[in-house]
Design a protein with these regions (language model features):
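Bacterial N-terminal signal peptides
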Residues: 7-16
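Bacterial N-terminal signal peptides that target proteins for export
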Residues: 1-7
Length: 249
Protein backbone atom coordinates (compact mmCIF):
# COMPACT_ATOMS: atom_id res chain seq x y z
CA UNK A 1 0.00 0.00 0.00
CA UNK A 2 3.01 2.33 0.33
CA UNK A 3 2.73 3.94 -3.09
CA UNK A 4 -1.03 4.33 -2.85
CA UNK A 5 -0.66 5.98 0.55
CA UNK A 6 1.92 8.36 -0.87
CA UNK A 7 -0.39 9.26 -3.76
CA UNK A 8 -3.27 9.96 -1.39
CA UNK A 9 -1.09 12.05 0.94
CA UNK A 10 0.36 13.99 -2.00
CA UNK A 11 -3.12 14.71 -3.30
CA UNK A 12 -4.13 16.16 0.05
CA UNK A 13 -0.92 18.17 0.45
CA UNK A 14 -1.17 19.61 -3.05
CA UNK A 15 -4.79 20.68 -2.70
CA UNK A 16 -5.41 24.44 -3.02
CA UNK A 17 -6.90 24.61 0.48
CA UNK A 18 -4.84 25.20 3.59
CA UNK A 19 -5.84 24.38 7.18
CA UNK A 20 -3.88 24.48 10.39
CA UNK A 21 -2.82 21.32 12.24
CA UNK A 22 -5.24 22.11 15.07
CA UNK A 23 -8.10 22.56 12.62
CA UNK A 24 -7.24 19.25 10.99
CA UNK A 25 -7.37 17.50 14.36
CA UNK A 26 -10.64 19.18 15.35
CA UNK A 27 -12.50 18.48 12.12
CA UNK A 28 -11.73 15.22 10.30
CA UNK A 29 -12.30 14.95 6.58
CA UNK A 30 -15.89 14.26 5.63
CA UNK A 31 -17.27 12.27 2.75
CA UNK A 32 -15.99 9.24 0.91
CA UNK A 33 -12.33 9.21 -0.12
CA UNK A 34 -11.46 7.19 -3.21
CA UNK A 35 -8.01 5.84 -3.99
CA UNK A 36 -7.01 6.19 -7.66
CA UNK A 37 -4.08 4.11 -8.89
CA UNK A 38 -2.42 6.49 -11.34
CA UNK A 39 -1.12 4.27 -14.18
CA UNK A 40 -1.47 1.35 -11.76
CA UNK A 41 0.95 0.75 -8.88
CA UNK A 42 3.66 2.20 -11.09
CA UNK A 43 6.24 2.47 -8.32
CA UNK A 44 6.60 -1.31 -8.35
CA UNK A 45 6.40 -2.49 -11.97
CA UNK A 46 6.40 -0.88 -15.46
CA UNK A 47 3.26 1.23 -15.70
CA UNK A 48 0.12 0.57 -17.75
CA UNK A 49 0.20 -3.22 -17.66
CA UNK A 50 -2.42 -5.67 -16.45
CA UNK A 51 0.02 -6.90 -13.81
CA UNK A 52 0.42 -3.47 -12.29
CA UNK A 53 -3.28 -2.61 -12.39
CA UNK A 54 -3.88 -5.93 -10.61
CA UNK A 55 -1.21 -5.06 -8.07
CA UNK A 56 -2.90 -1.74 -7.37
CA UNK A 57 -6.25 -3.46 -6.83
CA UNK A 58 -4.60 -5.90 -4.41
CA UNK A 59 -3.26 -2.89 -2.51
CA UNK A 60 -6.75 -1.45 -2.14
CA UNK A 61 -7.21 0.91 -5.08
CA UNK A 62 -10.81 1.86 -5.83
CA UNK A 63 -10.06 3.02 -9.38
CA UNK A 64 -7.40 2.13 -11.92
CA UNK A 65 -6.29 4.92 -14.23
CA UNK A 66 -5.17 4.14 -17.80
CA UNK A 67 -3.93 6.66 -20.35
CA UNK A 68 -5.56 5.78 -23.67
CA UNK A 69 -4.15 6.07 -27.19
CA UNK A 70 -5.24 4.36 -30.42
CA UNK A 71 -3.80 1.78 -32.78
CA UNK A 72 -3.84 1.89 -36.57
CA UNK A 73 -6.94 -0.30 -36.53
CA UNK A 74 -8.77 1.91 -34.05
CA UNK A 75 -8.28 -0.05 -30.82
CA UNK A 76 -7.73 1.77 -27.53
CA UNK A 77 -4.59 0.70 -25.69
CA UNK A 78 -2.94 1.93 -22.51
CA UNK A 79 0.30 3.88 -22.93
CA UNK A 80 1.53 7.10 -21.35
CA UNK A 81 2.17 8.49 -24.85
CA UNK A 82 1.48 7.36 -28.39
CA UNK A 83 5.26 7.48 -28.95
CA UNK A 84 6.32 4.16 -27.42
CA UNK A 85 10.11 3.93 -27.56
CA UNK A 86 10.32 4.93 -23.87
CA UNK A 87 7.74 2.40 -22.68
CA UNK A 88 8.32 -0.68 -24.86
CA UNK A 89 11.12 -2.69 -26.46
CA UNK A 90 10.18 -1.56 -29.97
CA UNK A 91 13.65 -0.13 -30.65
CA UNK A 92 14.98 -3.70 -30.44
CA UNK A 93 12.59 -5.00 -33.10
CA UNK A 94 14.36 -5.06 -36.47
CA UNK A 95 11.09 -5.73 -38.29
CA UNK A 96 9.79 -2.32 -37.19
CA UNK A 97 12.95 -0.28 -37.74
CA UNK A 98 11.62 1.36 -40.89
CA UNK A 99 8.61 2.78 -39.05
CA UNK A 100 10.66 5.13 -36.92
CA UNK A 101 9.56 8.63 -37.85
CA UNK A 102 9.21 12.22 -36.70
CA UNK A 103 5.82 13.80 -36.03
CA UNK A 104 4.45 16.94 -34.44
CA UNK A 105 2.08 16.09 -31.60
CA UNK A 106 0.30 18.97 -29.86
CA UNK A 107 2.92 21.39 -31.18
CA UNK A 108 5.92 19.32 -30.08
CA UNK A 109 8.21 17.51 -32.52
CA UNK A 110 8.76 13.89 -31.50
CA UNK A 111 10.86 11.14 -33.07
CA UNK A 112 10.19 7.46 -32.51
CA UNK A 113 7.50 4.85 -33.09
CA UNK A 114 3.82 5.71 -32.71
CA UNK A 115 0.87 3.49 -31.80
CA UNK A 116 -1.24 4.82 -34.67
CA UNK A 117 1.24 3.31 -37.15
CA UNK A 118 0.78 -0.23 -35.80
CA UNK A 119 -2.10 -2.69 -35.65
CA UNK A 120 -3.06 -4.17 -32.32
CA UNK A 121 -1.62 -7.51 -33.40
CA UNK A 122 1.74 -5.85 -34.03
CA UNK A 123 1.71 -3.99 -30.72
CA UNK A 124 0.95 -7.24 -28.91
CA UNK A 125 4.38 -8.54 -29.99
CA UNK A 126 6.03 -5.80 -27.91
CA UNK A 127 6.78 -5.88 -24.20
CA UNK A 128 6.61 -3.04 -21.70
CA UNK A 129 9.62 -1.49 -20.01
CA UNK A 130 10.12 1.06 -17.25
CA UNK A 131 9.53 4.61 -18.50
CA UNK A 132 11.56 6.36 -15.77
CA UNK A 133 14.54 4.12 -14.99
CA UNK A 134 16.41 6.98 -13.37
CA UNK A 135 13.66 7.24 -10.74
CA UNK A 136 12.36 3.66 -10.57
CA UNK A 137 15.40 1.54 -11.34
CA UNK A 138 14.07 -1.51 -9.47
CA UNK A 139 11.23 -1.74 -11.97
CA UNK A 140 13.72 -2.53 -14.72
CA UNK A 141 13.88 -6.09 -13.37
CA UNK A 142 10.41 -6.53 -14.88
CA UNK A 143 11.23 -5.12 -18.32
CA UNK A 144 10.20 -7.42 -21.14
CA UNK A 145 7.57 -9.36 -19.17
CA UNK A 146 4.24 -7.65 -19.88
CA UNK A 147 2.11 -6.92 -22.95
CA UNK A 148 0.47 -3.64 -23.87
CA UNK A 149 -3.12 -3.99 -22.62
CA UNK A 150 -6.22 -2.92 -24.48
CA UNK A 151 -8.90 -0.84 -22.78
CA UNK A 152 -11.23 -3.81 -23.15
CA UNK A 153 -8.79 -5.98 -21.21
CA UNK A 154 -8.58 -3.34 -18.48
CA UNK A 155 -12.37 -3.19 -18.19
CA UNK A 156 -12.49 -6.99 -18.05
CA UNK A 157 -9.94 -6.92 -15.23
CA UNK A 158 -11.98 -4.39 -13.26
CA UNK A 159 -15.12 -6.51 -13.70
CA UNK A 160 -13.37 -9.74 -12.68
CA UNK A 161 -11.69 -8.17 -9.67
CA UNK A 162 -14.94 -6.57 -8.55
CA UNK A 163 -16.49 -10.04 -8.49
CA UNK A 164 -13.48 -11.63 -6.81
CA UNK A 165 -13.01 -9.03 -4.08
CA UNK A 166 -16.58 -7.97 -3.43
CA UNK A 167 -15.51 -4.36 -3.98
CA UNK A 168 -16.47 -2.15 -6.90
CA UNK A 169 -13.33 -1.50 -8.93
CA UNK A 170 -13.77 1.52 -11.18
CA UNK A 171 -11.88 2.90 -14.15
CA UNK A 172 -10.61 6.46 -14.56
CA UNK A 173 -9.40 6.68 -18.18
CA UNK A 174 -7.61 9.68 -19.66
CA UNK A 175 -7.88 10.43 -23.37
CA UNK A 176 -4.37 11.26 -24.59
CA UNK A 177 -3.93 13.72 -27.47
CA UNK A 178 -7.58 13.43 -28.57
CA UNK A 179 -7.52 16.32 -31.06
CA UNK A 180 -4.41 14.88 -32.72
CA UNK A 181 -5.99 11.45 -33.03
CA UNK A 182 -9.21 12.98 -34.38
CA UNK A 183 -7.17 14.84 -37.01
CA UNK A 184 -5.85 11.54 -38.40
CA UNK A 185 -9.25 9.87 -38.43
CA UNK A 186 -8.95 8.04 -35.10
CA UNK A 187 -11.23 9.84 -32.63
CA UNK A 188 -11.40 8.48 -29.09
CA UNK A 189 -15.09 8.94 -28.45
CA UNK A 190 -16.56 6.06 -30.47
CA UNK A 191 -14.33 3.21 -29.27
CA UNK A 192 -14.22 4.62 -25.74
CA UNK A 193 -17.99 4.68 -25.29
CA UNK A 194 -18.44 1.37 -27.13
CA UNK A 195 -16.06 -0.36 -24.72
CA UNK A 196 -17.69 1.20 -21.66
CA UNK A 197 -21.17 0.30 -22.91
CA UNK A 198 -20.07 -3.30 -23.47
CA UNK A 199 -19.35 -3.54 -19.75
CA UNK A 200 -22.57 -1.82 -18.72
CA UNK A 201 -21.07 1.58 -17.92
CA UNK A 202 -23.65 4.01 -19.27
CA UNK A 203 -25.15 5.89 -16.32
CA UNK A 204 -23.76 8.71 -14.19
CA UNK A 205 -23.67 6.31 -11.24
CA UNK A 206 -21.27 3.95 -13.04
CA UNK A 207 -17.79 3.64 -11.47
CA UNK A 208 -16.23 5.61 -14.32
CA UNK A 209 -14.69 9.06 -14.70
CA UNK A 210 -13.42 10.13 -18.15
CA UNK A 211 -10.70 12.77 -17.98
CA UNK A 212 -8.75 14.90 -20.43
CA UNK A 213 -6.44 17.90 -20.56
CA UNK A 214 -8.22 18.94 -23.75
CA UNK A 215 -11.61 20.61 -24.02
CA UNK A 216 -13.41 19.70 -27.23
CA UNK A 217 -13.39 15.93 -26.73
CA UNK A 218 -15.07 16.38 -23.36
CA UNK A 219 -17.69 18.61 -25.00
CA UNK A 220 -18.28 15.93 -27.62
CA UNK A 221 -18.60 13.28 -24.94
CA UNK A 222 -21.02 15.40 -22.93
CA UNK A 223 -23.57 15.16 -25.74
CA UNK A 224 -23.13 11.39 -26.03
CA UNK A 225 -22.89 10.01 -22.50
CA UNK A 226 -24.16 10.42 -18.97
CA UNK A 227 -20.83 9.29 -17.54
CA UNK A 228 -18.90 11.73 -15.37
CA UNK A 229 -16.32 13.88 -17.15
CA UNK A 230 -13.26 15.55 -15.62
CA UNK A 231 -11.43 18.55 -17.09
CA UNK A 232 -7.76 18.21 -16.18
CA UNK A 233 -5.68 21.36 -15.80
CA UNK A 234 -2.03 22.32 -15.64
CA UNK A 235 -0.71 25.10 -13.45
CA UNK A 236 0.16 27.05 -16.60
CA UNK A 237 -0.26 26.88 -20.34
CA UNK A 238 -3.28 26.08 -22.48
CA UNK A 239 -5.20 23.01 -23.64
CA UNK A 240 -3.65 21.62 -26.83
CA UNK A 241 -6.92 22.13 -28.69
CA UNK A 242 -7.74 25.60 -27.31
CA UNK A 243 -4.71 27.87 -27.50
CA UNK A 244 -7.08 30.83 -27.13
CA UNK A 245 -7.61 29.80 -23.50
CA UNK A 246 -5.38 29.35 -20.50
CA UNK A 247 -6.16 26.66 -17.95
CA UNK A 248 -7.22 29.22 -15.31
CA UNK A 249 -9.80 30.56 -17.78
Amino acid sequence: MTHLHLLLIATILLSPFSISESQAMEKPLEGHVIVIAHRGASGERPEHTIAIYSRAIDQGADYIEPDLVLTKDGILVARHENEISETTDIADKAEFADRKTTKTIDGQKMTGWFTEDFTLAELKTLRAKERLPQLRSANMAYDGQFEIPTFDEILALAKAQSAATGRTIGVYPETKHPSYFASIGLPHEGPLLAALTKYGHVEKSAPVFIQSFEVENLKALRSKTKLRLIQLMDEKGSPADRKDLTYPQ
